[in-house]
Structure formats: C-alpha cells, structure tokens
Amino acid sequence: MSKNNSTVIKMDEQVLKYKEDLYEKTVHHLKVTIPKKIAEYQELAKSYGQNSENEQDGQTSKKRKLDSEDYVLMPIEDLIKTNRVIMETHQKFKKAYIELIETFSVIRGWISLNIPRIEDGNNFGVDVQEDIITQITKLEEVYTSLLDGSESYFASRASLVKKILKHKDIEAYRYSLAQVDEKEFTRFSFSYFDLANNYATTYSLIVKNFAKLETPRPTNASNIY
Amino acid sequence: MSKNNSTVIKMDEQVLKYKEDLYEKTVHHLKVTIPKKIAEYQELAKSYGQNSENEQDGQTSKKRKLDSEDYVLMPIEDLIKTNRVIMETHQKFKKAYIELIETFSVIRGWISLNIPRIEDGNNFGVDVQEDIITQITKLEEVYTSLLDGSESYFASRASLVKKILKHKDIEAYRYSLAQVDEKEFTRFSFSYFDLANNYATTYSLIVKNFAKLETPRPTNASNIY
Amino acid sequence: MSKNNSTVIKMDEQVLKYKEDLYEKTVHHLKVTIPKKIAEYQELAKSYGQNSENEQDGQTSKKRKLDSEDYVLMPIEDLIKTNRVIMETHQKFKKAYIELIETFSVIRGWISLNIPRIEDGNNFGVDVQEDIITQITKLEEVYTSLLDGSESYFASRASLVKKILKHKDIEAYRYSLAQVDEKEFTRFSFSYFDLANNYATTYSLIVKNFAKLETPRPTNASNIY
Amino acid sequence: MSKNNSTVIKMDEQVLKYKEDLYEKTVHHLKVTIPKKIAEYQELAKSYGQNSENEQDGQTSKKRKLDSEDYVLMPIEDLIKTNRVIMETHQKFKKAYIELIETFSVIRGWISLNIPRIEDGNNFGVDVQEDIITQITKLEEVYTSLLDGSESYFASRASLVKKILKHKDIEAYRYSLAQVDEKEFTRFSFSYFDLANNYATTYSLIVKNFAKLETPRPTNASNIY
Amino acid sequence: MSKNNSTVIKMDEQVLKYKEDLYEKTVHHLKVTIPKKIAEYQELAKSYGQNSENEQDGQTSKKRKLDSEDYVLMPIEDLIKTNRVIMETHQKFKKAYIELIETFSVIRGWISLNIPRIEDGNNFGVDVQEDIITQITKLEEVYTSLLDGSESYFASRASLVKKILKHKDIEAYRYSLAQVDEKEFTRFSFSYFDLANNYATTYSLIVKNFAKLETPRPTNASNIY
Amino acid sequence: MSKNNSTVIKMDEQVLKYKEDLYEKTVHHLKVTIPKKIAEYQELAKSYGQNSENEQDGQTSKKRKLDSEDYVLMPIEDLIKTNRVIMETHQKFKKAYIELIETFSVIRGWISLNIPRIEDGNNFGVDVQEDIITQITKLEEVYTSLLDGSESYFASRASLVKKILKHKDIEAYRYSLAQVDEKEFTRFSFSYFDLANNYATTYSLIVKNFAKLETPRPTNASNIY
Amino acid sequence: MSKNNSTVIKMDEQVLKYKEDLYEKTVHHLKVTIPKKIAEYQELAKSYGQNSENEQDGQTSKKRKLDSEDYVLMPIEDLIKTNRVIMETHQKFKKAYIELIETFSVIRGWISLNIPRIEDGNNFGVDVQEDIITQITKLEEVYTSLLDGSESYFASRASLVKKILKHKDIEAYRYSLAQVDEKEFTRFSFSYFDLANNYATTYSLIVKNFAKLETPRPTNASNIY
C-alpha cells in the first residue's frame, strides 16, 4: 500500500456490463436452451436405442455395427477403410459437446462474477456458489476430454490396421479391431442418455438454488456490485 | 443479478416430465428387472460352476478350457486361432454389462433430479441420496471398464502370438498364452456370481432406503418440485 | 417421486431367497470349509518346509530348485525348457486361490445384503459389517492379483530366454533367469503359510463378530427384511 | 543469534521502492489494463464465434477449418504443409497469454510483499491475501502450460505426417491428422471466451477484496512497513 | 440372518490348536531365535566392517571390491564374468531375509488371531496389537522386496555388459558397470547392521508390549477364545 | 541410556562457532546482498523487456529471436547450429540461480541451528522458524530444478534436429524446433522478474519475522545454546 | 495366549548389551565424530568455493571445469574420455555419504531401542523420540539415494557419447554433454556445504533433546529396561 493513503478501486463499468451480458445469457439458457436440449437428447436416446434393437433383430437393412466374425472374413481393403457411420456420429457428438461446454461456461462465468467479497462468516450462499461452480467445471472437463475421443479412436484404429497389414495371419489383431469399433457404438448408445442426464442434473442443481446464486448474502446486497 | 430486480426461474415442465419418466422406469426396475436379473445370474453362476467341475472330471466332451500342456503340443496353426468359447462368452458378458449400466444409470438419473435445494441443515436424507449416487456411479465405472476387457484380451493374445511365431523354440511364450486364455475362463467363473452379487447388494441398498430417496426432507415436500 | 403419492417398494421374495442361500453357505463355510482349509494348509506349509530342508541337505533325489551355478553350466536346450515343478505348483496354488476367493465372496455377499437401512445413529453394528466387508474385499483383491502371478512369471522367463539365445556370452542373463525361477520357489515356500494365516485371521475376525454381522441393530430386527 | 545482543534488521529502502513500483503498476492494471482486456476478448469471442457460424453455412470464401473428408482426398504434398491459420492464431494467443501472466504476476508480487509479520491471530486479512495469491498462481500456471500448446501441436502433427508418409494406404492416419488440426480450432473457439472469463473472475476477486489486500490488519498499520 | 433364529458360531478346535502352535513358536522366537540372530548379525557387521578396512589398506590378498580403474583396464572376457563374491553374498543375505520373514510372520499370525471382538471402546490394547502388526508387516514388506535385489542386479549387469560389448570405445559404460558392482558391496556393508538393528527394534517393541499383545482387554479374558 | 547414570551432552564449541559464522553471513545477506540483487534484477527485467519491444518493432539490428517462418526457410546447416544468444543467456541465469541457492541455504542453515529444544507448548516462534525454513527449501528446490533447464533444452533440440535431418520434407519438425527455441526466450523474459520477485518475497518474509527467528521463545534464552 | 497362564518375556541380556554398545557409540559420535565432521566440511566448503573462484579468474592451471565451447571444439577421442576430476570427487563424496549414514544409523538404532512400552498418555518424550527417528531416517534416505548419483551420471554420459558418435554433425548433443558434466561440478559446489549443514542441523536437534531421548518418561525409569 502506498505509504500515505489507501486507493479506492471500483468495479469498472465495462466489466459490470460484461457481467450483465452473461446474466442475460444465463437466464435464456435456463428458460429456453437447456430444457430444449434435455427433451431433444431424451428423444435421441430413445430412437438410438430402438435402432440398435431393430438392427439386432435384423429388421434394418443398413447394418451400422458389424459382428466380430465379419472382421475376420472381410477382405483387407474393406477392413482398413474407416467406418463412415462412426465418423459421422463422432462429428454429431462433438458439436453437441461443444454446445454443452459453451452453454454451461457462460453460466459458470456469471456465477463467478457474482461471488461477493470474502467475509469471515455468513458464507452459506457463497458455499452454494462455489459448490455449483465446482460441479459445472467438472462437467466441462468431462466433455472437453470427450472431445479428444475421436483422435484417440483414429490413432488406435490406425495402429491396429498397421499390425493387421504386417501380420496377416494373426487373427487376434482383427478381433481387436472389431472391439475398437464396437466400443465406439457402445459409447454412442450411452452418449445421448448421458447428455440428457447431465444437462438435467446440472440444470436441476442451478434452478433449485438460483436464489442463492443471485443473492448469496441476502441482508446487504450492496457488496455484490 | 440484474441491477434492479431478481428473476424467478422455475423447473421447466419438459424437465419435470423427463424426471417422471425416469421415476417410472426406476420403479419398474426395482419391482421387475432387477429381481429377475438376480435370479437369472444366480442360476447361471450355479450352472457355469457345475460345467467347470464336470469338465475337470472329464465328463463333458467339449473341453472349453485347454491345459497348459495342450498349448505346448498344439500345432502353431491351431495355437494362433482365437478360442471360439472365449469370444462368445465375451459377447454374452458385454451384453449383460451394458444392461446393468443402463438399468442403474436410469435410477441414478432419477435420484440426482430428486436432490432438493442445498440447505444449511436437515440434510440427512440428501446425504443418503448422495451416498447411493456414489455407490451406483462406482458400480457403473467398474462395469464400463470391464467392457474394455475383450479389447485388452485380444491385444495381449495378438502380441503373444506374434512372439510365438517369431521365437518358435521359446516354450515359455506358449505357456504365457495358455495363462492369458486360462485367465479369461477364471474371470468368467467369477463373473456370473459377481453380477448376481452386485445387482443384489445395490438393489438392497436402494430398496431399504427408498423412502429417503423419494422424500429426503419429509417436512416440506414443496422444495423438491 | 410421482407428484401425488409415494411408492412402497419391498424386498422381492427371490432376492430374500438369494440372501438366505448365501447365509446357509456362509454358515457351512465357517463350520466346515474354512477350519478344514486352515488345517490342510498348516500341514502343507510344514511338509513343504521339510522338503526344502531335506533338499538343501541333499537328502532328496529329485531336486526341484537348481542352484545359480547349474544355470550357467546347463546346455541351452535344457535352460529354455520350463521347470515342470514350477508349472505344476502354479496350477495347485491357482486352484487354492480361486477356492479362497469363492469362499469369502459368498460371505461378503451375505454381509452386504444384511446391511440395514442407513440411519443417523446406532451404527456401531453397521460399522463392524462395513469394516469386515473391507477386510474381505482386500483379501480377495490380494488373491485375485496373485492369480496373475504365473502369467507374469512366464512372460519374464520368455523374455530372458530370448536374451540368453541372443547374447550367449553374457553370463549375467543366465544368473538373472536363475533368480526368476528361484523367486518362484521362495514364493511357494511362503504361500502355504500365508494361505493358512489369511484364512485363520479372516475367519477369526468373522467368527468373533458374527453376532454383530447377523444383527447389526439389536433393538428393531424388522428393518433388516 | 549472536551470543550477546539481537540485531535489528529493517526493510531496505530499495526494496520498499520496488514494492511501491509494483503497487503503482497494480493500480494501473486494475483501473486500465484489465477492464480493457476483458472488453477486447469479449468482442473477439463474439466475432470468432460469428466467423465459425458463417463458415459452417459456407458464407466465407477462406475456409480456415477443413472437414475430415478433405484430409482423405487431399494430395500428400498439401497434407504435410502446416495450416497457416493455425500457426498465426497460435502466435496471437501466445502474445495474449504472456500479457496475462505479466499482468497478474505484478499484482501477485505486490500482494506477497504486503503480507505482514506472522502473528498468532487476527489473520483474516492475511488469509484473504494468501487465498488470492493462490488463485493468481493457479491462473499463471494454467496459461504458462498453455504456452507449450503449439510445441506439442507441431510435435503431434510431425509424427502423424511421418506415419502418413510411411503408410500411405492407412486412411485412419489421415483422419487422425484431421482431428489434431480440428482440435486446435475447437480450442481457439473457447480461448477468447476463457481469456475474458479468467480476466474478469480474477479481477472481480481482487477488486472486491482490495481493501483487505492493502490493509490486512486494520488496527496497526505499522507492521506492514 | 435366517428369518427365525440366529446361529451360534464358535471358534473351531482345529483353529484354536493352530493359534496355540503359533503362540508356542512366538515364545520360542522371542526367547531364543531372535536374541541369537541379533548377536550373530552384530558380529557379522563388525567383522564385515573390519574386512573392508583391511582391504582398503591393502592388507588382504583377495580383493573382493575392484576400483573403477580396474574396470577400464580389465580385458572384456573378465569384465563380463559375474563377480563370485557378489553372488555368494547375495545367496547368504537371501537366506537371512527369508529367515527374518518366516520368524516375524509367525508372530504376526499369532497377534492377529489374538485380536478380540470389535467393541465400541476399551480398545487401547487392540490399538497396540494393530500398531505392532503394522510395524511387522512393514518389516516383512521391506525384506520381501530386498529378495528381488539379486534379480535386478543381474538384469542391470547383463544390460550394461551388452552395451559394453556393442560400444567398446565408450569408457563410461565400463565405469557405469563398476558403479553397479560397487553399489552391491556398499549395500552389503549396511545389510548386517540393518538386520541386527531391525531384529532388535522390532523385538524390543514386541517384548515391551507383550502383556498387551497377550491380553488386550484385561477385564474379561473370555472374549479372546 | 546406560543402566546407572544419564550423560550430559553439550553443544560443541566448534558447532557454536559454525552457527555464529552462518549468523554473520545471514545478517550480511539481509543488509547487503539481497537488497542489491533485488534492485539489479528489477533493472534487468526492465531492460530485457525494453529490448524485446525494440526487437519486435525492428529497431535493433541483432535479432535474438527468429520467427517460425525463418526456421522453415533457413538452410539446414544453419538450422542445426545452436543459438549463441540462448546459450550465453543460459550461462548467465545459471550463475544467478546458484547465487540465490547459496544465499538462502546459508540463512536456512542458521535458522535450523537456532531451533530450540522441542517443548510441549509455547511453540509459536518455532512454528514461524519451521514455516520460513519450508518456504526457503521450496525456493531452493525450484531454482535447483531450473538449473537442469539447459540440459533438457539441448536434449530436446538435439532430438528434433535429428528428426529434421531424417525427415527433410516434414515442415512441422522445423516449426517444432522454432517453438523449442522461442520457449527459451519466453522463459528468459519472465526469469529476471521472477528472480526479483522471489528474492523480494522471501526477503520480506524473513525481515518482518527476524525477531522470532532470532528468539523463538522470548522468556528463557538459555535453551537456545 | 496359552489357555491357562500368561508368559513373562524379558529383554534378553544379549540385546541389552547390544543396546549399551549402540549407546556408547552414540555418545562418542555426539562428542567427537560429528563436531569434527562439521568443522571438516565447513573448511572443505570454503576451500572448494575458493578454488572455483580462482579457476573462473584463470588463476589455477589445472582447469577442472571445461566451458561448453570446449566441448564443441574438442576432438571426439578426448570428448568420450571420462573426466578424471569428476570421478575422483565422486569417490570422495561416496565415502563421506557412507560415513554419514553409518554414524546416524547407529544413533537411530539406539533411540529406537530406547522407546518405552506403548502407553495411553504421558507420551511427549516418546513423540520427541519418534520425531527425531523420522528426521534421521529422512537424512539417511537422502544420502542413500545420493550414493546412486555416480551410476546415473555415467549412464547419462555413456548414452550421450553414443549419440555424439552416431550423429557427429548435431552440435546440440555436445552441448548436452557439457551440461551433464557441468551439473556434477555444480552439485559438488553445494555438497560440502550441505554435508556441514545436515550434520549440524541433525546434531543440534539430537543434542538439544538428548535428555528426552535418554529418559522419555521421567517418572518411572523401570519401563525402559
């Protein structure tokens, strides 16, 4: 501190405007974007589940998921081609994951800017804010790491294809490749349900505690700027 | 919070409908799906155990599990073929694991959406909800990682077969391959018992505490939406 | 919870029958299987110890354990053969380990199903149940990882044999192989004592606390179904 | 301590001047630099988001982000060229990250030098200082590690290009390269929002608690030199 | 628990006999085996120390430990031979380590079987039992991992000899080999002292607290069976 | 303790003299060395910052930092030459880091020797001593690991140059090398500020608490020897 | 415990004699060995520091430490020769480290054997004993791991020399080798100071608390045997 007097630093108008902008986006997300997303993914989870069942009972022509046996009998030129269905589904899910991260990072941004001055008590509301920021940050980290899913899928596929080409007589490499592709379909079958579930659980946490997020210390509102 | 007034955000009807849908599925799972699964896996554990005993006493013709010695004497072309029994049993267990994950993630979803607003006390019911969500999440993680079992089995088998082909005179690689296959049979012999046991233990935890899961704070039901 | 009334979910008869079946097996294990195992392994530990001593004093013809020097002088064709005694002993111990895991996982299963509803106090009995479940789970994990022992033994042996064949003049690889085999014999010499000791210690813990395992909350038995 | 008398050591004038210099820079950053940065990155986040949307609807000629398919069809000489847009955007972000680190390390330096003598109580203000130093240090560590982003991007790109050149028929390597580049664009799309958000959250924390940072122990100012 | 009555399970006579057998061995170890071992290793530590000093002053003809320089000048055929002294000393120490493990695992076994029923208080004696079991387990783990010492010594020696043969002009590999052998001699010089010290410290802990190990809960002896 | 009487052991005069010598060096460092260093590095940070700005605006002839593009166009013989400026700056910083470690390890040595006898209370002063020893030890560890910086820089540079020579057509390796060199200049730009900041923060901590470091327990000075 | 009576086990006379022997060595170390070592290393630190300064100002003929440039210009046959000064200094330090470990492990041994029976209170003295045993164990671990220093130095040197021979045109490998050697000289320059400092700090801790180490529970000496 300067030797003679202490300096008064106030929240800059531009920053308050930035916070207000995040607040409006937050309200829009809670009233419109998120409920719509939950309904959308609930439907997609149902229809995706239905498709897999039809496929297992042979009702659909276009088989997305091959059986392990197919991988052993398939000529090598087909084997090393990338499965179009897997690639397209990856792109769809990446868009969905980016949307989720963008939506909740706005809400996290607003809550962080709404944390009042550190005080030696009366912190229940601040604990709620910090608890919810932690939950949202965890959610964003899960979906950020899921974004790397396709890179690691292609890397494993490429290295197995390399081994298949090098050791044409070792059947187990082909089965291993079958498992790598099958795992993607298994993950897809959970992904829509998980998206609906994660949106809903985090939405429910925020909505039920919105009053505390807005006014962490009810008595003296002034300290929140 | 907007400078002048605070916004009221209510749980969206679509989300409440989503929660109701999860609730009905949860009740169905507790009354029908899970008890049926426990009985099914209890039987499979008994019959699987019986088969292994008959096989050891040479009563069954079709030997699923070869002895180590077989692996040393077997011609290389047979050695490098994948064991059909192991592959089929993998596929059966993967289906069972996916079913378990789907069943309990629905229940976890409902419980999460039933967690009331964060309050500074009267949280015994919420602690029960969070404790059971943690147990279910752990169960789902165990079975999600078990889904990778077949990929790592084929990868180890392939790399050992490669070494056997390259070092035909090193007996120990063949014994190592025998252990890799034998370990799968040992795992299968535990898997049905573990499935019955895990379904039953988690079911017992949920059923005995269902009242608290439904109504974590008895006095004022309104705060659960 | 459904908006109008709360649902009563009771423990399904099939699950209670499953629990009863585990209970009867538990009593049988405590009264018959385990005491018999402890005596059996106590004897095997003594006789195994006796054999090693006779062998060191050269009394027995068939030397199971070779000295390091033998490994340096031995022709390479013999060196790369797997030691029959080690393989047979592995198979014996694997059977013993599987039996131990099966025996205690049944007891663990029964105790888990006997954990009463979560309550905010009067939990001393439940703590005893959870403490003993933790001890049994640790024991099962130790013996499950010991099951992998033979696979890693053969993998180390194979890779050393490969180096010996490649670098015939490097004596130290042959000594290293001698150590790998010798370590198996050292482990065997402890294994029977450890089996007796682990069975006895876990048995003693369960038997001394059996009343609490059966009736964790003495006053009101109804809550255990 | 010297056997006879204790030595009085006072804060050197040069060090007090150094602290005063950091203090003035801190005030300038809080009043000018940081609010300007928040507004700047808020704008960049909006305009960057807008560009990506236009690009996806094909409105802009210069496509920064290629689709996976482009990577499979592209001739190898183009494939192995580094994407100019990615490189330029890296350089821009590195400048922004260095600025952020320089800005907040000055503020951290001032706060550290303003921590008073260790006392056995009356430490609420010191806890606020230490808490904020921890937050700033975390922020600096995040952006220091982000500085390594471009080195690891080029290393992954180089090693994938090497594999593509070596295994021209393995399509999956090309898709893997597409993911590596696409990931950079996804990171860029978050980076401006994160910069605005991190500046604002840390700024809000410092400004709201500036009084405590300046005068951690209100009663006796003398102990802060 | 069976729906109608609770079962009484008592400690099986065979198990009590097993415990009694461990008890007698424990008393013998404390009165005879261990004091003798401490004296023996105290002597060996002194005489080993004396030999090293004589060797450094050149008094002994047979130099066990070569200087680094010897390794550079030595012809390659001698260099790649394993140092007889190191091998023989390894075998001696392995015998000593196995003895230590066998001795204390018997004592640990007895103490474990003497742990009374879990009670909600009056546990000071039980804490002493568990503390001493932890100390003995740590000691067994240290000496079990030391048993692997010779395997890793030969593995490092073999891989360095391989490099020396491949890069005859790189002096530093020969110095590295000198360090690997020298390190064994340094370890040997500590090993006898450590054996005496570990035996004595653990013995002192057990003897001083023997009353508590025998009778953890003085008042009612019946609960220990 | 010897069976009959207890031995009195006093601090040896040579050790007290050693402590006095450390004390005098400590006072000299706090009054002279450190303030001078803080001022010196504050200046160097400013001038280093100024140079980089001039360079970016092209005012200086001798460009220390090349742009990524230079690395792609540069002939390979120049590319594989080590950047003189980076090497010289490394040597300068290593000297500065060694000085910092020597300066503060003397102060840490004195404080450690001034820790009084362990007592069951009245330990506030001792806690201050131990807290400051921990801070200084952390500082020394940071700068000891920074000393390894140049070894790892040359190792990364060498391995990238090797790849560039092997894969002349893979541009990304050249960009990767550009990043490795650029990272050193970025680190240099922070290093002088960090040196000033770390000296100042640790100095301020020691000076403000010097009375407690000298006399941790005011009442009875005798126990500090 | 045997079913009828409890056994009295007393500390064996040989063990008490062993403890007395450690006690006498401890007193000798505290009165003679350690103070002498502190003075010796204090001197060596000063003279080593003096030599480095003279060398930097070119006063001494025999340059122990070469500059990085020397490594680039030096013919390869000289480069691959091991630096005699580094090797001799390693041997000197190894002797010093072994002495330190032997000295303090004797003291640790005595303290451990002087720990009284575990009691439910009155444990301040025992806490002091355990705290000091922990400090001495940490010191022994630091110097045991430093003993491996020369092995890892020669391993790094050998692998860099291999790379220099393989890639004669990559200058950076020669600079990397210069850093590896320079790091040893930097470590040497700290080692004597650290030896003096570690001896002194541990000595000061033991001497100031010697009364508690000897008589942890003043009231009743009998329980210490």
Curated annotation (Swiss-Prot), chains A, B, C, D, E, F, G:
GO cellular component, one term: protein-containing complex
UniProt KW keywords: Nucleus, Proteasome
Annotated localization: Nucleus
Pfam families given in the database record: PA28_C (PF02252)
InterPro entries according to UniProt: PA28_C, PA28_C_sf, Proteasome_activ_PA28, Proteasome_activ_sf
Keyword Nucleus belongs to the record: yes
Gene3D superfamilies: Proteasome activator pa28, C-terminal domain
GO biological process per UniProt: protein catabolic process; regulation of G1/S transition of mitotic cell cycle; regulation of proteasomal protein catabolic process
SUPFAM superfamilies: Proteasome activator
Molecular functions (GO terms): endopeptidase activator activity
Subunit record text: Homoheptamer. The homoheptamer associates with the 20S proteasome.
Similarity section: Belongs to the PA28 family.
Function: Subunit of the 11S REG (also called PA28) proteasome regulator, a doughnut-shaped homoheptamer which associates with the proteasome. 11S REG-gamma activates preferentially the trypsin-like catalytic subunit of the proteasome. May also be involved in cell cycle regulation.
PANTHER family: LD45860P, PROTEASOME REGULATOR PA28
Name this polypeptide is given: Proteasome activator 28
Species of provenance: Dictyostelium discoideum (Social amoeba)
Organism classification: Eukaryota, Amoebozoa, Evosea, Eumycetozoa, Dictyostelia
Gene name linked to the record: psmE3
